[in-house]
Amino acid sequence: MAAPQKKAKREGRQIVFVDESGISERPTRVRTWAPKGQTPIIQFHFNWNHVSVIAGLTRTNCLFRLHEGSIKKEEIVDFLKALKAHLKAPLLVIWDGLKAHRSRLVREYLDGLGGHIQIAFLPPYAPDMNPVEYLWAWLKRHALANYCPNNLGELHSTARNKLKSAQKRPLIIAACWVQATLW
C-alpha cells in the first residue's frame, strides 16, 4: 500500500479510505452495571431491521451517508459523487474488494472522471488496515453501546447525530488512523 500512497502524494491527491457497515436495531451490549442482585436488562423487540452506512475517512474528516437496506453499486456511485463534490482535490480512494466496488457501474463512473478519482484496493482479509473499521468500532461499542431504539427512524437519527459528533472531534478521527497504524 505504500506505493499508492507515495504516488498520491506526488500527484497531490487526498487519500480517502472508504468502507460500509450495518447498524442494527438490536443493541450492541457492552459493559453494564446494576446494584448487586439486580440483573441489568435491556428491553428490545425482535424486529431487527438495520441501517447501512458508508463512510470516507480523510486525515482530518469523516464523510458519511446512511441508507435503509443494503448499500449497492448505485449508492456507492452516489457516495463517490458526494466525495468528489465535497473534497474538490483529486482523490485516491482505498477500499476493500467488495463486489459492488468492482461493478461495471462504478468502473464506468470512475472512467468518466478523467482520473480525478483513482482507486486502490486493500489486501484481502486486511480490515485492520482500514481506519474506517475503527470508526465503526467507536460507533458501535461506544457511541451506540447498549442503545436500544424504538424504531428504524430513531436508529437512523441517532446514528447520524453520533457520526456528526465524530466529525467535530478530531481526536476520534486521529485515533482511527493510529489504530490502523498508517500514520
Spans of model-derived segments:
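Short functional hotspots at interaction and active-site rims
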Residues: 1-183
